[in-house]
Amino acid sequence: MRRLIFTFCLLLWAPSIPLSAQNTLSSIRQRYAEQQEAIRHMEAGSMPREYYHVHGAVNLPATGQHDEDIYLYYEEVEERADENAIYLPHRLTFVTTAYNYSFRRFYEEFLYDADGRVAFIYARNPDIVFGLDYDFRFYFSRGKLLHAIVKRGINKDADAARLIANGTWNASLPTDSEGHQQVCAGDKLPKEFHSVLADCLKSAKRYHKLFQDTDRALYGALF
């Protein structure tokens, strides 16, 4: 009975996400779902394709062939258009990028708000611990980190038995439907992942500039 009362008290005092933050998270997730739905329609041919596809192939010293596929999705912005404009200006909404360094494969997504600030980042990073893939989800409000979720799972090409035997992977911990274990979740990001967040934010700015330059070169010529 004492244990039940103690557990109940812990639940009452456990930190919760403020209502305003919950609303922001819900809004970001809704916009993300809408973007995914739009991409599915584009791929099916049921709506016009509105993106730039950039592919880079570079032979890097020591690591060899490096390939990167970047998709820059955009939308038309009526409220910023001149009243006599035939072509409406574009605004970046979403970016996906898949790339490799040697045999390690990375994947990232960036969702932007109407002001061009990143609102959500998803990053799959195989570089934190050898043999494991780390999944990072960063949510932002007005450019500041609002919520972070970090999970990890065994890389599909890794020797799972060896990772368990050497203590890299604790098989006794619970996993989700994808076989991932949650490392942390909340508005405070552990210091060991600060560099990952910093790199992701730099990438968000770099891809936004890439969109602006590409849009100006390919679409701006029509004005």
Q: Which residues does each PLM region occupy?
A:
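Short loop/beta submotifs within extracellular cysteine-rich repeat domains
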Residues: R117-F120, L145-L146
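Short N-terminal edge-element motif at the start of the domain
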Residues: V54-V118
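Positively charged n-region of N-terminal signal peptides that target proteins for export
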Residues: M1-L4
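Sec/Tat signal peptide C-region and signal peptidase I cleavage site
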Residues: I17-A21
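Beta-turn initiation residues at beta-strand->coil junctions
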Residues: T96-N100, Y122-P126, V150-R152
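Long terminal segments
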Residues: Q22-R80, F130-F223
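Short beta-strand-initiation
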Residues: T7-F8, R105, D133
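Bacterial N-terminal signal peptides
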Residues: T7-S16
